[in-house]
Amino acid sequence: MKVILAKQAGFCFGVKRATQMAFEAADKGGKTYTLGPIIHSPQVVQKLEEMGVKALKDISGMDDGTIIIRSHGVASGELEEAVRKELEIVDATCPFVKKAQEHVESLSQAGYDVVVVGDADHPEVQGIVSYASGKVYVVGSGDEAAKLPKMAKIGVVAQTTQSFENLKNVVDACLTKGGEIRVFHTICDATAVRQEEAKELASQVDCMIVIGGYNSANTKRLAEVCTELQPRTYHIEMAQQLNPRWFEGVGKVGVTAGASTPKWLIDEVLEQIEKINKDKNH
């Protein structure tokens, strides 16, 4: 059985940067917390907890210490509160997310109604939305955008993990809604590259394994993209979840991982697949 690992599997630039910053802060010791999970990888969050860094839902109970801002960013009000409390802030917000926040802020100040393409329940989107001082709408698809009211000036940004296709569909729908539209391409290339590569790989193999947190939006999207081309696609968080039955009659296995999946988790999965393959051949 041949195992092919996607070249772009695992940490993207923003996640790598955020985890490095978090582990460096943890090494310094002292009271250190992250505001929400640093990235959407329960295993990385657990490692940080073992080093004494706990994830907080909010900073209302914090009076001193270091607060690490998660890679997805946080609401502007929470950042202001951290500054007011004079906490030491380690801002690990992904620069691409930061860009989307800044666009929303400036569009809003310039009198545009803002449309954010994304998942309203996702912390990244909730953070981006908080930078709007005027009207702001969150839509998940072109169909949802078609239900928006008429607006004079529309500014569009996207959650960084959205597909380019979805952004285009929303923009098409917005063209019928306003006289002036400004669109900022805030989708991260790492997401698009991973999806394209995963599609290509899924079409060449008999079974596809996608590794990453069940709470990771980009990993879930990878699994969806792969399933369309290879129904035998399995989304797992760690090696122990691999089932030998999945590999029955399989000649080629494709493996990819979300942008918040650490290399050590990918390595463990590859080792376990190798072990299953050996047992199968005995």
From Swiss-Prot:
It holds the Pfam family LYTB. It is an enzyme of class 1 (oxidoreductase). InterPro entries: LytB/IspH (IPR003451). GO terms for biological process: dimethylallyl diphosphate biosynthetic process; isopentenyl diphosphate biosynthetic process, methylerythritol 4-phosphate pathway; terpenoid biosynthetic process. [4Fe-4S] cluster binds at C12, C94, C188. This is 4-hydroxy-3-methylbut-2-enyl diphosphate reductase. Keywords: 4Fe-4S, Iron, Iron-sulfur, Isoprene biosynthesis, Metal-binding, Oxidoreductase. Dimethylallyl diphosphate binds at H40, H72, H122, S216, N218, S260. GO terms for molecular function: 4 iron, 4 sulfur cluster binding; 4-hydroxy-3-methylbut-2-enyl diphosphate reductase activity; metal ion binding.
